[in-house]
Amino acid sequence: MDVEVKKENQNTQLKDHEVKELIKNSQNGDQKARDLLIEKNMRLVWSVVQRFLNRGYEPDDLFQIGCIGLLKSVDKFDLSYDVRFSTYAVPMIIGEIQRFIRDDGTVKVSRSLKELGNKIRRAKEELSKSNGRIPTVQEIADYLEISSEEVVMAQEAVRSPSSIHETVYENDGDPITLLDQIADQSEEKWFDKIALKEAIKDLDEREKLIVYLRYYKDKTQSEVADRLGISQVQVSRLEKKILKQIKNQMDHFES
C-alpha cells in the first residue's frame, strides 16, 4: 500500500480520551489497539514526512521510518501527561527520520536539483558583481528565466542539513545537538507547524512560499521581502491575509 493510499486511510479522527484509552490498551499488549492507533495517525506521520522530501529518499521509505517513531511514541507515552498524544509524537517521528538520514551518511539530492543549485550560485555571483549588492530571489529567477519558487526550493534542497546535528553544548562528554534542542523545545510549536502544513494546501504558490519561509525557515518579514523582491509592508499584508484564510482549517485539524 503506497503513501497516497495511507494518506486517505484516515476517515475519522479520534478524540483525545479515545486515543489515550487505545494507548493504554496497546501498552498492555492489545495488538488491535496498536494497529488502530497507527491507522488513525497516518496523516500525522505523512505530514512530518513532507518536511524531508526532495532529499532523494522514497516517500514510502520515509513513511515507514516515521511509523517506527510513531510506535516508539505509543510505547513511551506517559498517560499522566497533560498533553495530546500527537503533540508528544511529532518530535519522536521527526527524530526517527533524522536519525535515519544521519545514519545513512549521505544527503541525496537529484542531479537536476544540483545543477540548478549550481546555476543559481553562479547567477548570484554574476548579479552581485554587476549590481554591487546581493540579488533578490526574483532577480535571480528573472535572470535564469525560472520561477522564484524554483530558486528557493533548489537552494533549500542542496543546502547541507548537517548543521542540525552539530554539537551546540557538551557536558562531561555528553554532546547536545541542535536536533536535541529542537526536540526539547515546546512540542506545541512542532505540532502547530504540522497543522499549518495541512492547512496551506489551498494557497497559491507565492502564499505557500511566504508560509514556508516565515514558519518553516523562521525568516523575518524583511528577509522574506528581500528574497521575493517585494516590500516588507506587502509581506505583512499578505501574511495577515494568509493567516486569516487558514485559521478555520487549522482549527479543524486540531479539533
From Swiss-Prot:
UniProt keywords, alphabetically: DNA-binding, Sigma factor, Sporulation, Transcription, Transcription regulation
Highest taxon listed in the record's lineage: Bacteria
Name of the encoding gene: sigF
DNA-binding in keyword set: yes
UniProt GO molecular function: DNA binding; sigma factor activity
Physiological role: Sigma factors are initiation factors that promote the attachment of RNA polymerase to specific initiation sites and are then released. This sigma factor is responsible for the expression of sporulation specific genes.
Motif Polymerase core binding per record, residues: 61-74
InterPro entries according to UniProt: Cro/C1-type_HTH, RNA_pol_sigma-70_dom, RNA_pol_sigma-B/F/G, RNA_pol_sigma-F, RNA_pol_sigma70, RNA_pol_sigma70_r2, RNA_pol_sigma70_r3, RNA_pol_sigma70_r4
UniProt cross-references to SUPFAM superfamilies, sorted A to Z: Sigma2 domain of RNA polymerase sigma factors (SSF88946), Sigma3 and sigma4 domains of RNA polymerase sigma factors (SSF88659)
Entry's Gene Ontology BP terms: DNA-templated transcription initiation; sporulation resulting in formation of a cellular spore
Keyword Nucleotide-binding: no
Origin organism lineage: Bacteria, Bacillati, Bacillota, Bacilli, Bacillales
UniProt cross-references to PROSITE patterns, sorted A to Z: SIGMA70_1 (PS00715), SIGMA70_2 (PS00716)
Gene3D superfamilies, A to Z: 1.20.120.1810, Winged helix-like DNA-binding domain superfamily/Winged helix DNA-binding domain
One matching Pfam family: Sigma70_r2
Name recorded for this polypeptide: RNA polymerase sigma-F factor
Family: Belongs to the sigma-70 factor family.
DNA-binding segment(s): 221-240
